[in-house]
């Protein structure tokens, strides 16, 4: 998967997970996060029909009510996260003007490398699709 869970930003009750999970357990959490959606739909014996509708509802509410919520969105990047001319899922502030700002979260060197790898995988698929 091209998902890059940011374990360096993960906390529990305000405490960084790195303070109570060793590297092996952190890697386990990362891998489980990547497949969590598929695991849940398999356990429920259904498809992901609710989540997309709920996500659209949150987006519309943030625009209509100018809530300026930070919401993960697939957006065309122009230098953010070191990427340009590619749509990737990143956090953005959504308000009455739509995308008000792409939130450029500081990444560790390892996370930057994984993000670049994911971006290159998307570029490869886009190339296969002739985008």
Kindly give the residue locations of the regions a language model identified.
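C-terminal substrate-binding/catalytic lobe of Rossmann-fold NAD(P)-dependent dehydrogenases
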Residues: 1-131
